[in-house]
Amino acid sequence: MRKNGFIILLLMLFLTSCGEYQRLLKSRDPEEKYQAALQYFNQKEYVKAQTLLDDISSYYKGTERSEDILAYLARCYMGQKAYESATEYYQAYVRNYPKGKYATEAHFQVGHCQYMDAPDARLDQQITQNAIQAFTIFVELYPESPYAEQAYTEMSELYDKLARKELYNAQLYYNLGSYLGNNYASCEIVAKNALKNYPSNKFQEDFNWLILQAKYQQMVQSVEEKKLDRARDTQDEYYNFITEYPDSKHRKETDKMLIQIRKITKE
Protein backbone atom coordinates (compact mmCIF):
# COMPACT_ATOMS: atom_id res chain seq x y z
CA MET A 1 0.00 0.00 0.00
CA ARG A 2 2.79 2.39 0.89
CA LYS A 3 4.50 1.66 -2.41
CA ASN A 4 1.30 2.30 -4.36
CA GLY A 5 0.75 5.53 -2.46
CA PHE A 6 4.26 6.69 -3.28
CA ILE A 7 3.77 5.93 -6.98
CA ILE A 8 0.47 7.82 -7.01
CA LEU A 9 2.15 10.80 -5.32
CA LEU A 10 4.92 10.83 -7.93
CA LEU A 11 2.36 10.62 -10.71
CA MET A 12 0.41 13.54 -9.26
CA LEU A 13 3.58 15.63 -8.99
CA PHE A 14 4.50 14.78 -12.58
CA LEU A 15 1.06 15.72 -13.88
CA THR A 16 1.11 18.94 -11.86
CA SER A 17 4.53 19.78 -13.28
CA CYS A 18 3.38 19.06 -16.83
CA GLY A 19 0.26 21.10 -16.27
CA GLU A 20 2.28 24.05 -14.99
CA TYR A 21 4.63 23.89 -17.98
CA GLN A 22 1.71 23.74 -20.42
CA ARG A 23 0.18 26.74 -18.69
CA LEU A 24 3.44 28.66 -19.04
CA LEU A 25 3.58 27.88 -22.75
CA LYS A 26 0.18 29.51 -23.17
CA SER A 27 0.97 32.44 -20.89
CA ARG A 28 1.13 35.93 -22.41
CA ASP A 29 3.37 37.23 -19.66
CA PRO A 30 6.99 37.35 -20.95
CA GLU A 31 8.38 38.10 -17.50
CA GLU A 32 6.70 35.04 -16.02
CA LYS A 33 8.09 32.90 -18.83
CA TYR A 34 11.57 34.35 -18.37
CA GLN A 35 11.66 33.68 -14.63
CA ALA A 36 10.26 30.19 -15.16
CA ALA A 37 12.90 29.52 -17.84
CA LEU A 38 15.67 30.42 -15.40
CA GLN A 39 14.14 28.12 -12.82
CA TYR A 40 13.94 25.25 -15.31
CA PHE A 41 17.54 25.94 -16.33
CA ASN A 42 18.71 25.75 -12.71
CA GLN A 43 16.84 22.44 -12.41
CA LYS A 44 18.70 21.23 -15.54
CA GLU A 45 15.46 20.95 -17.50
CA TYR A 46 17.15 22.48 -20.49
CA VAL A 47 14.56 21.69 -23.16
CA LYS A 48 11.79 23.40 -21.21
CA ALA A 49 14.02 26.39 -20.46
CA GLN A 50 15.07 26.66 -24.10
CA THR A 51 11.49 26.48 -25.36
CA LEU A 52 10.34 29.29 -23.08
CA LEU A 53 13.36 31.45 -23.91
CA ASP A 54 12.84 30.95 -27.63
CA ASP A 55 9.22 32.00 -27.19
CA ILE A 56 10.09 35.36 -25.61
CA SER A 57 13.34 36.18 -27.42
CA SER A 58 11.63 38.32 -30.07
CA TYR A 59 9.67 40.23 -27.40
CA TYR A 60 12.87 41.30 -25.63
CA LYS A 61 14.88 41.95 -28.80
CA GLY A 62 16.86 45.17 -28.49
CA THR A 63 16.56 45.27 -24.70
CA GLU A 64 19.13 44.52 -22.02
CA ARG A 65 17.39 41.25 -21.28
CA SER A 66 18.00 40.08 -24.85
CA GLU A 67 21.66 39.59 -23.94
CA ASP A 68 20.72 37.33 -21.02
CA ILE A 69 18.32 35.31 -23.15
CA LEU A 70 20.93 34.69 -25.84
CA ALA A 71 23.48 33.57 -23.25
CA TYR A 72 21.02 31.24 -21.55
CA LEU A 73 19.88 29.78 -24.86
CA ALA A 74 23.51 28.91 -25.60
CA ARG A 75 23.80 27.36 -22.14
CA CYS A 76 20.61 25.36 -22.69
CA TYR A 77 21.99 23.82 -25.88
CA MET A 78 25.25 23.13 -24.07
CA GLY A 79 23.31 21.40 -21.31
CA GLN A 80 21.57 19.25 -23.93
CA LYS A 81 24.96 18.39 -25.46
CA ALA A 82 23.72 19.92 -28.72
CA TYR A 83 27.20 21.28 -29.34
CA GLU A 84 26.69 22.51 -32.89
CA SER A 85 23.69 24.62 -31.87
CA ALA A 86 25.48 25.79 -28.72
CA THR A 87 28.42 26.91 -30.85
CA GLU A 88 26.13 28.92 -33.12
CA TYR A 89 24.47 30.67 -30.18
CA TYR A 90 27.76 31.47 -28.46
CA GLN A 91 29.11 32.81 -31.76
CA ALA A 92 25.98 34.95 -32.10
CA TYR A 93 26.57 36.28 -28.60
CA VAL A 94 30.19 37.19 -29.42
CA ARG A 95 29.08 39.00 -32.58
CA ASN A 96 26.29 40.93 -30.87
CA TYR A 97 27.91 41.55 -27.48
CA PRO A 98 31.70 41.46 -27.97
CA LYS A 99 32.22 43.18 -24.61
CA GLY A 100 29.10 41.87 -22.90
CA LYS A 101 28.92 40.44 -19.40
CA TYR A 102 29.09 36.87 -20.74
CA ALA A 103 31.80 37.62 -23.33
CA THR A 104 34.58 35.67 -21.59
CA GLU A 105 32.38 32.62 -21.19
CA ALA A 106 31.07 32.87 -24.75
CA HIS A 107 34.52 33.12 -26.33
CA PHE A 108 35.69 30.11 -24.34
CA GLN A 109 32.58 28.07 -25.10
CA VAL A 110 32.91 28.64 -28.86
CA GLY A 111 36.13 26.64 -28.61
CA HIS A 112 34.94 24.20 -25.96
CA CYS A 113 31.70 23.27 -27.76
CA GLN A 114 33.65 22.49 -30.93
CA TYR A 115 36.22 20.60 -28.86
CA MET A 116 33.37 18.45 -27.53
CA ASP A 117 31.97 18.05 -31.06
CA ALA A 118 35.28 17.23 -32.76
CA PRO A 119 35.07 13.87 -34.59
CA ASP A 120 37.32 10.83 -34.58
CA ALA A 121 40.79 11.50 -35.99
CA ARG A 122 40.03 9.37 -39.05
CA LEU A 123 37.32 11.82 -40.15
CA ASP A 124 37.43 15.36 -41.51
CA GLN A 125 39.00 17.67 -38.92
CA GLN A 126 37.55 21.06 -39.87
CA ILE A 127 35.72 21.30 -36.53
CA THR A 128 38.97 20.51 -34.72
CA GLN A 129 40.74 23.29 -36.60
CA ASN A 130 37.88 25.70 -35.87
CA ALA A 131 38.11 24.87 -32.17
CA ILE A 132 41.85 25.54 -32.12
CA GLN A 133 41.29 28.88 -33.84
CA ALA A 134 38.59 29.80 -31.31
CA PHE A 135 40.81 28.86 -28.36
CA THR A 136 43.71 30.83 -29.84
CA ILE A 137 41.54 33.94 -30.02
CA PHE A 138 40.26 33.30 -26.50
CA VAL A 139 43.68 33.03 -24.82
CA GLU A 140 44.87 36.14 -26.66
CA LEU A 141 41.87 38.12 -25.43
CA TYR A 142 41.67 36.66 -21.92
CA PRO A 143 45.12 35.32 -20.91
CA GLU A 144 44.29 35.67 -17.20
CA SER A 145 40.85 34.07 -17.42
CA PRO A 146 40.02 31.14 -15.10
CA TYR A 147 39.17 29.27 -18.31
CA ALA A 148 42.64 29.81 -19.82
CA GLU A 149 44.26 26.68 -18.36
CA GLN A 150 41.41 24.48 -19.61
CA ALA A 151 41.61 26.17 -23.02
CA TYR A 152 45.33 25.33 -23.30
CA THR A 153 44.72 21.75 -22.18
CA GLU A 154 41.93 21.18 -24.69
CA MET A 155 43.87 22.92 -27.45
CA SER A 156 46.79 20.54 -26.83
CA GLU A 157 44.42 17.58 -27.14
CA LEU A 158 43.06 18.99 -30.39
CA TYR A 159 46.57 19.34 -31.82
CA ASP A 160 47.20 15.73 -30.84
CA LYS A 161 44.06 14.75 -32.72
CA LEU A 162 45.36 16.47 -35.86
CA ALA A 163 48.70 14.73 -35.34
CA ARG A 164 46.94 11.39 -34.94
CA LYS A 165 45.21 11.93 -38.27
CA GLU A 166 48.60 12.49 -39.90
CA LEU A 167 49.88 9.36 -38.17
CA TYR A 168 47.04 7.38 -39.75
CA ASN A 169 47.90 8.91 -43.13
CA ALA A 170 51.59 8.11 -42.78
CA GLN A 171 50.79 4.54 -41.70
CA LEU A 172 48.50 4.16 -44.70
CA TYR A 173 51.26 5.20 -47.09
CA TYR A 174 53.65 2.79 -45.40
CA ASN A 175 51.17 -0.07 -45.69
CA LEU A 176 50.70 0.68 -49.40
CA GLY A 177 54.43 0.20 -49.85
CA SER A 178 55.43 0.12 -53.51
CA TYR A 179 51.88 -0.14 -54.81
CA LEU A 180 51.49 2.26 -57.74
CA GLY A 181 54.63 4.16 -56.80
CA ASN A 182 56.97 4.83 -53.91
CA ASN A 183 54.55 5.24 -51.01
CA TYR A 184 57.41 4.87 -48.55
CA ALA A 185 58.66 8.29 -49.63
CA SER A 186 55.17 9.71 -49.10
CA CYS A 187 55.07 8.12 -45.65
CA GLU A 188 58.36 9.78 -44.79
CA ILE A 189 57.17 13.19 -46.02
CA VAL A 190 53.89 13.05 -44.09
CA ALA A 191 55.65 11.97 -40.89
CA LYS A 192 58.30 14.68 -41.14
CA ASN A 193 55.70 17.36 -41.83
CA ALA A 194 53.67 16.21 -38.83
CA LEU A 195 56.72 16.50 -36.57
CA LYS A 196 57.32 19.99 -37.92
CA ASN A 197 53.70 21.15 -37.70
CA TYR A 198 52.95 19.54 -34.32
CA PRO A 199 56.28 19.64 -32.46
CA SER A 200 54.74 18.87 -29.06
CA ASN A 201 52.51 16.00 -30.16
CA LYS A 202 52.50 12.77 -28.15
CA PHE A 203 53.16 10.52 -31.17
CA GLN A 204 56.72 11.66 -31.89
CA GLU A 205 58.26 8.23 -31.41
CA ASP A 206 55.63 6.70 -33.71
CA PHE A 207 56.40 9.23 -36.44
CA ASN A 208 60.16 8.73 -36.12
CA TRP A 209 59.70 4.97 -36.17
CA LEU A 210 57.72 5.24 -39.42
CA ILE A 211 60.43 7.45 -40.90
CA LEU A 212 63.09 4.87 -40.05
CA GLN A 213 61.00 2.02 -41.43
CA ALA A 214 60.25 3.94 -44.62
CA LYS A 215 63.93 4.71 -45.19
CA TYR A 216 64.85 1.08 -44.52
CA GLN A 217 62.30 -0.24 -47.01
CA GLN A 218 63.50 2.21 -49.65
CA MET A 219 67.03 0.95 -49.03
CA VAL A 220 66.00 -2.70 -49.31
CA GLN A 221 64.04 -2.15 -52.51
CA SER A 222 66.52 0.26 -54.04
CA VAL A 223 68.38 -0.26 -57.30
CA GLU A 224 72.07 -1.03 -56.79
CA GLU A 225 73.42 2.40 -57.73
CA LYS A 226 71.30 4.06 -55.00
CA LYS A 227 71.53 1.35 -52.36
CA LEU A 228 74.73 2.52 -50.63
CA ASP A 229 73.57 6.12 -50.27
CA ARG A 230 70.22 4.98 -48.93
CA ALA A 231 71.91 2.56 -46.53
CA ARG A 232 74.01 5.39 -45.10
CA ASP A 233 70.95 7.61 -44.84
CA THR A 234 69.05 4.84 -43.06
CA GLN A 235 71.99 4.22 -40.74
CA ASP A 236 72.01 7.90 -39.74
CA GLU A 237 68.29 7.66 -39.06
CA TYR A 238 68.86 4.53 -36.97
CA TYR A 239 71.36 6.32 -34.73
CA ASN A 240 69.07 9.33 -34.41
CA PHE A 241 66.24 7.04 -33.37
CA ILE A 242 68.10 5.01 -30.74
CA THR A 243 69.66 8.18 -29.32
CA GLU A 244 66.24 9.75 -28.90
CA TYR A 245 64.48 6.56 -27.80
CA PRO A 246 67.08 4.21 -26.25
CA ASP A 247 64.40 2.17 -24.49
CA SER A 248 62.00 2.02 -27.42
CA LYS A 249 59.79 -1.04 -27.77
CA HIS A 250 61.15 -1.24 -31.33
CA ARG A 251 64.80 -1.52 -30.22
CA LYS A 252 65.23 -5.19 -31.15
CA GLU A 253 63.79 -4.58 -34.59
CA THR A 254 65.97 -1.52 -35.16
CA ASP A 255 69.08 -3.48 -34.19
CA LYS A 256 68.16 -6.14 -36.75
CA MET A 257 67.88 -3.36 -39.31
CA LEU A 258 71.40 -2.21 -38.46
CA ILE A 259 72.79 -5.67 -39.22
CA GLN A 260 71.32 -5.52 -42.73
CA ILE A 261 72.45 -1.92 -43.19
CA ARG A 262 76.05 -2.84 -42.34
CA LYS A 263 76.02 -5.63 -44.91
CA ILE A 264 75.65 -2.86 -47.47
CA THR A 265 77.87 -0.17 -45.94
CA LYS A 266 80.54 -2.79 -45.01
CA GLU A 267 81.04 -1.04 -41.67
Would you name each region that the model predicts?
Residues R2-F6, F14-E267:
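Acidic, polar-rich low-complexity tracts and alpha-helical solenoid repeat scaffolds
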